[in-house]
Amino acid sequence: MNIIQKEKKNKKPLDIKKIKIGLTKSFSLKITEKLHNQFKIFSGDVSPIHNDIKFCKFNKFEKKLGYAFLITSALSKIYGVYFPGGNELCLHQSCNFKNPFYINDILLFKLKIVQVNQLTKIVSINTEVKSKKKIIFDGHSILKLSLKK
């Protein structure tokens, strides 16, 4: 899964004092046919809505739909490698799938820290994902920071 961002992986853990409410980060991910097929194999989801163009068109979709849970898989990588400091443990993730997305779409992830507890090292993050300027996903996560390796 090739998450595209300008910065490299976090090599050094962030100091908890640098993780502030309002801190935002953006990432993008292209949903390639290869990534789509890898997720199909991994998940075992062979539903025709994701894999049969005739079925999709009959149901008024222009193309095969992307797998919604590919978004949460990308979030797992973002939390574990990039943001807010890498090496986080996801304690909770809410998911609201608002609109479909398709193979070859580029998903734009915007994450914003909305709560930080420096004592417990727990942060809350709101996430919004867009494709072609449409919101396709929003959610809320609670992460336990594990800032030291």
Language model features: what each stretch is:
Residues 1-24, 28, 101-149:
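HotDog/MaoC-like acyl-thioester-processing domains
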Residues 2-88:
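Hot-dog-fold acyl-thioester-processing enzymes
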Residues 41, 47, 53-58, 78, ...:
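Short, surface-exposed, polar/charged, turn-prone segments marking secondary-structure boundaries
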Residues 81-105, 109:
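Mid-chain, well-packed structural core segment of small domains
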